[in-house]
């Protein structure tokens, strides 16, 4: 299958350590250095207010681990970062960073709580998180709502980087909805077949301002 002309923005070597922890615990590792280079490419010096969507081509492609790692790497470099869990059907950010948060993004979008009441600080960096800890009956409707667009626009105005974690591109149109709100969509691929990657690119092509590939590479067996 011929892949569309989309740049490969990064190749991230994976190891036994979780990527989101490696950027903190093992900053000189190949994985951490690759994430830092990616974070710097996404947010060059002097640039602020960028929104980046991290979406997998297929389930199990480590996108949440990468989203948390990018947020932590940028925060360690002194940037103001917010990470949004936009995977309403299968939220993973809170679990990935080891917290239990009962407020979350949905309460802010529906007006039940002020936005400031829904933020919580990452346990291992200065990044701020907006988690989604509950299943929703109508996630696509909420993601496409004016409230979601206004939230992302507001955060872009006060932060250097907004990272949005998303579910698989081909499962629903959720990722495509979030791509409309983002400057760059990182399409994360690991073991997805080329046809799946090509189909995901086509799905994003009509909505995303820019799409770039990130390959998560498992170590090869000896």
Can you annotate each of these PLM segments?
Residues 1-68, 72-80, 86-106, 116, ...:
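Short boundary/hinge segments that flank catalytic cores
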Residues 3-8, 174-188:
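Gly/Ser-rich helix-loop-strand patches that form or flank binding pockets
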Residues 50, 128, 160, 183, ...:
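Conserved acidic residues
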Residues 83, 129, 164, 186-187, ...:
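Structural beta-sheet core signal
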Residues 84, 104-110, 129-178:
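Switch II (G3) loop of P-loop NTPases
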Residues 122-128:
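Beta-strand-turn-beta hairpins that frame and shape the catalytic cleft
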Residues 165, 169-171, 182-198:
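Conserved Switch II/interswitch segment of TRAFAC-class P-loop GTPases
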């Amino acid at each position: 299958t011929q892949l569309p002309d989309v740049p490969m923005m990064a190749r991230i070597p994976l190891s036994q350590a979780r990527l989101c922890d490696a950027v903190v615990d093992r900053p000189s590792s190949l994985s951490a250095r690759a994430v830092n280079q990616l974070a710097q490419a996404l947010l060059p010096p002097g640039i602020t207010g960028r929104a980046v969507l991290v979406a997998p081509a297929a389930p199990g492609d480590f996108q949440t681990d990468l989203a948390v790692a990018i947020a932590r790497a940028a925060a360690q470099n002194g940037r103001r970062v917010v990470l949004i869990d936009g995977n309403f059907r299968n939220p993973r950010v809170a679990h990935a960073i080891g917290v239990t948060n009962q407020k979350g993004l949905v309460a802010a979008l529906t007006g039940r709580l002020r936005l400031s009441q829904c933020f919580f600080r990452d346990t291992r960096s200065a990044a701020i998180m907006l988690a989604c800890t509950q299943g929703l009956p109508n996630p696509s409707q909420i993601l496409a709502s004016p409230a979601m667009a206004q939230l992302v626009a507001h955060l872009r105005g006060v932060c250097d980087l907004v990272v949005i974690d998303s579910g698989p591109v081909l499962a629903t149109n959720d990722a495509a909805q979030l791509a409309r709100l983002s400057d760059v969509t990182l399409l994360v691929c690991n073991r997805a077949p080329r046809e799946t990657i090509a189909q995901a690119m086509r799905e994003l092509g009509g909505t995303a301002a820019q799409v770039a590939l990130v390959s998560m590479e498992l170590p090869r067996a000896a």
